[in-house]
Amino acid sequence: MKNGKIGVTTENIFPVIKKFLYSDHEIFLRELISNAVDATQKLKTLSSIGEMKGELGDLTIHVAVDKEAKTLTVTDRGVGMTAEEVDKYINQIAFSGAEEFMEKYKNQSIIGHFGLGFYSSFMVADKVEIFTKSYKKEAKTVHWSCTGTPEFEMEETDAEHDRGTTIVLHLSEDSLEYAESSKVEELL
């Protein structure tokens, strides 16, 4: 188990993100789906150049809502992340993992950047959890959670999780419409 603080330049970054950075509250879903598409594209790229061994399998991105649990979940079977990558790309706000990847694989088309966009989730969620497992051999599942403060919890676990990333948004009381299938379908 690792506890730590998310690296930010100001203690008040989350209220800024929640209230001012994104005037369109529905951007969070586009950002999460864009990140899932990026992760899937990266996996395809790595597979095509022989750096990822094994079957790609079903690369469909899934969005699910649970009205009772008040959650919205986005799941992909892309590259996933190791604990070190979560530390680097999630815990250091605004650093984009896509930049490094694009530099290494310049000729490939990669959209979006995993950075601040992920944090738009806190506009609608009181708590965000990530369950992720890298495509890399011997990778462990990483569980990360944050309640919208600069503090997070992260641990590697032996829990079964397919390659890829699942992001669970525990919706805030004023955003429960995103636990409605009809609302999410409208946005997609």
Regions found by a protein language model. Name each.
Residues 1-178, 186:
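GHKL (Bergerat-fold) ATPase N-terminal catalytic module, capturing the glycine-rich phosphate-binding loop
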